[in-house]
């Protein structure tokens, strides 16, 4: 069987399983099975598909038909132009989270704290973009911290990033220039409506704090003033309907210059605030 024939058969199979981007996902999984760069797949479609590659492709298709995310199947996800290892112990880095990176890089910083780091994509990216900066990244999951450590090492920032097992600020006595977080923010009653890729395959600890979805923001807002240097910034990713509530929590904690920033689709995506300089 040629690779092209395997791809042609795979697309309707994934579509029948409810995969919206069946052709895109089939191509990515075939490239993974053939151990080639996805950008070069078209050049190899006329090639015979070796039995071992065919077996890998079949296993990958079965996993995707069961709605496992492509990133988990291939073991990596692109974020800000870099490849990050992902597992079932971490959320896949989302394109919308790149808005946090863009906002963070708009001003200088020497020290950064990433709360609930997961894959480490936020902290690692910021340190890779700012070679003189140092950071701390926390998570409640030892397994997630292990993934973050792999990514920090692979992308050359391990010597400048300290990973800590911590419930938000519990293991962080320091003050920093910049605090960021993409915390769990799905309300308990919204979990059932999530896509199967998220609801069935990603860690619920990283998705929802339970209740109204705001508990993580309450904890971060309470702790941020004691962990920011004067003039330091807080950047939080939020759900589309949470802008007013999260901004209110941050203002009540004593931070200033609080604003809600939209994503490229015009939906509320970030809350930005600053500790007064004096």
Swiss-Prot record:
Q: Which GO terms describe its molecular function?
A: nucleic acid binding; protein-(glutamine-N5) methyltransferase activity; protein-glutamine N-methyltransferase activity
Catalyses which reaction(s): L-glutaminyl-[peptide chain release factor] + S-adenosyl-L-methionine = N(5)-methyl-L-glutaminyl-[peptide chain release factor] + S-adenosyl-L-homocysteine + H(+)
Question: Which keywords does this Swiss-Prot/TrEMBL entry list?
Answer: Methyltransferase, S-adenosyl-L-methionine, Transferase
Gene Ontology BP, a term: methylation
Listed Pfam families: MTS, PrmC_N
As recorded in UniProt, its EC number(s) are 2.1.1.297
Residues binding S-adenosyl-L-methionine? 116-120, 139, 168, 182
Question: Which InterPro entries does the UniProt entry name for this protein?
Answer: DNA_methylase_N6_adenine_CS, HemK-like, N5-glutamine_MTase, PrmC_N, RF_methyltr_PrmC, SAM-dependent_MTases_sf, Small_mtfrase_dom
Residues annotated to bind substrate: 182-185
Q: Which family does it belong to?
A: Belongs to the protein N5-glutamine methyltransferase family. PrmC subfamily.
Which HAMAP family does the UniProt record give?
RF_methyltr_PrmC
The protein's role, per its UniProt record = Methylates the class 1 translation termination release factors RF1/PrfA and RF2/PrfB on the glutamine residue of the universally conserved GGQ motif.
Write the protein's name: Release factor glutamine methyltransferase
* Gene that specifies this protein: prmC
């Amino acid at each position: 069987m040629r690779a092209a024939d395997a791809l042609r058969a795979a697309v309707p199979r994934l579509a029948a399983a409810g995969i919206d981007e069946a052709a895109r996902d089939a191509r990515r999984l075939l490239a993974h099975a053939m151990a080639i760069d996805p950008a070069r797949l078209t050049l190899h479609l006329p090639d015979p598909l070796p039995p071992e590659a065919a077996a890998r492709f079949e296993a990958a298709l079965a996993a995707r038909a069961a709605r496992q995310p492509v990133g988990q199947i291939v073991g990596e996800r692109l974020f800000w132009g870099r490849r990050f290892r992902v597992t079932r112990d971490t959320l896949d880095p989302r394109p919308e989270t790149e808005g946090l990176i863009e906002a963070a890089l708009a001003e200088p910083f020497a020290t950064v704290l990433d709360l609930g780091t997961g894959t480490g994509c936020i902290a690692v990216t910021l340190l890779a973009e700012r070679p003189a900066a140092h950071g701390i990244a926390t998570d409640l999951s030892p397994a997630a911290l292990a993934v973050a450590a792999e990514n920090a090492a692979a992308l050359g920032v391990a010597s400048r990033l300290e990973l800590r097992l911590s419930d938000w600020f519990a293991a962080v006595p320091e003050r920093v220039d910049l605090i960021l977080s993409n915390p769990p923010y799905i309300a308990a009653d919204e979990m059932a409506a999530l896509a199967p890729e998220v609801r069935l395959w990603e860690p619920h600890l990283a998705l929802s704090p339970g209740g109204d979805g705001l508990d993580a923001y309450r904890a971060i807002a309470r702790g941020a003033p004691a962990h920011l240097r004067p003039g330091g910034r807080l950047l939080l990713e939020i759900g589309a309907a949470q802008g007013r509530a999260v901004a209110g929590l941050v203002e009540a904690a004593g931070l200033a210059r609080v604003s809600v920033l939209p994503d490229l689709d015009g939906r509320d995506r970030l809350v930005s605030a600053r500790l007064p300089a004096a």
